[in-house]
Regions:
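Active-site activation/catalytic loop segments of kinase-like enzymes and analogous catalytic loops
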Residues: 257-293, 305-325
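ATP/Mg2+ or Mg2+-diphosphate-binding catalytic cores
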Residues: 311-350
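Secondary-structure edge/capping motif, primarily at the C-terminal ends of alpha-helices
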Residues: 156-160, 185, 189-195, 217, ...
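Surface-exposed helix-capping loop/turn segments at secondary-structure junctions
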Residues: 154-164, 217-222, 291-295
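ATP-binding pocket architecture of kinase catalytic cores
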Residues: 55-160
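Active-site catalytic-loop/activation-segment of kinase and kinase-like phosphoryl-transfer enzymes
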Residues: 165-217
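Active-site acidic catalytic loop and adjacent metal/ATP-binding pocket
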Residues: 42-51, 58, 211-261
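Conserved NTP-binding catalytic cores of kinases and kinase-like/nucleotidyltransferase enzymes
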Residues: 1-97, 241-242, 350
């Protein structure tokens, strides 16, 4: 979920000044534009506005199928849930009338909401400034983010039916045909079926095992406890103070209801062995704040088998093997092993 940012200073158009006045007081004197759009169907512009008094505020101008008033209000409420636990998250604002303006902007019909300008830098900015190494630093905050997330899980928030961007067995937005896990698995199957014929029996065996596991998981998954999460813990969203301490998160546009175990497993990804250790570490941290139910313990291994063995990185590994028969066999054998192995997660949840 890394963002491709395009940042530049921009002249303040009179229309933007008028839009700003719908949310805030003060006279805008400068603006910084950050473009985090992802193609024609997901337009996102952030304007950081500075007033003549030196105050900074944020306008978000968005056109996609998952940003609409009801969802923004849900983000707004979830921000307050995080703040209630002592974590810093910039507040999200309606306009002065209590709504969210819809405007024509860059040839698109866009909704607009506002945010408090963050008093803390994201980890990615501190790394870019040469203060530390981003990848290493993200690992340094592992306990912080899973302590925080477990506390949110323990609240069992139920104020929304909108799923998070990590949702399983349902879709995040109308343009999604299937959930991301199934999308990745189908992409794996498509490529695996193009392998030389001598591998196709194993490919079919893997697919049958994966499909049977997913179908069995589906029935029990709907009964697992849920809460509401920010759902995007990459370094661009982790807020760090000047002393290097973790303070909170921002960017709630993937926020929503989710099963905590799904969220935890989806946020921890690497090669098989490292990935399992990351999940176990996160579970160990989480259980200090969250009591895993017997249903969650029983679902942990089937959930892992559903999410991880056919993740998009496994397609990449197969493609990297090219025409090397030994390399292909190695990839398939590892997938089949981790799809069927009796991996212990329960002892890390007790």
């Amino acid at each position: 979920m890394n963002k491709m940012n395009n940042t530049k200073s921009t002249h303040i158009d009179p229309a933007i000044k008028e839009l700003f006045s719908c949310f805030f007081d003060g006279k805008p004197v400068s603006a910084e534009l950050i473009d985090t759009s992802r193609g024609e169907d997901d337009f996102r512009n952030t304007l950081i506005i500075t007033t003549d008094g030196g105050e900074r505020s944020v306008l978000k101008i968005v056109s996609n199928d998952f940003t609409f008033p009801e969802r923004i209000l849900m983000w707004q409420r979830t921000v307050e849930d995080y703040r209630d636990l002592g974590y810093y998250c910039p507040r999200i604002f309606c306009d002065k009338s209590g709504g969210f303006p819809v405007i024509d902007y860059h040839g698109k019909r866009c909704i607009v909401y506002a945010e408090e300008f963050s008093i803390f830098k994201p980890l990615s900015d501190r790394a870019a400034d040469g203060e530390n190494d981003q990848a290493v630093s993200a690992k340094a905050y592992f306990k912080d983010i899973w302590s925080m997330s477990a506390q949110l899980a323990a609240k069992k928030l139920d104020h929304t039916e909108y799923p998070s961007g990590y949702c399983l067995f349902e879709t995040f937005c109308p343009s999604d045909r299937i959930d991301e896990v199934m999308e990745n698995a189908l992409e794996w199957k498509k490529y695996a079926l193009s392998l030389p014929v001598e591998f196709l029996e194993q490919v079919q065996r893997i697919w049958d095992a994966w499909s049977a596991n997913r179908e069995a998981l589906k029935e029990r998954y709907s009964r697992l406890p849920t809460s509401v999460f920010q759902a995007d813990l990459n370094p661009t969203n982790l807020l760090i103070d000047e002393s290097g301490a973790f303070r909170g998160v921002y960017d709630f546009n993937l926020c929503g209801r989710d099963v905590f175990l799904n969220y935890l497993m989806r946020e921890n990804y690497a090669d098989f062995e490292e990935e399992i250790e990351l999940i176990r570490r996160a579970l160990t941290i989480a259980k200090e704040h969250y009591a895993f139910s017997e249903a969650e313990k029983a679902a942990a291994l089937p959930l892992y088998r559903c999410i991880k063995p056919l993740w998009y990185t496994r397609v990449y590994d197969l493609k990297q093997a090219g025409n090397d028969a030994a390399g292909i066999m190695h990839c398939l054998d590892r997938i089949e092993h981790y799809l069927t192995a009796d991996i212990d997660f329960i002892s890390y949840m007790d």
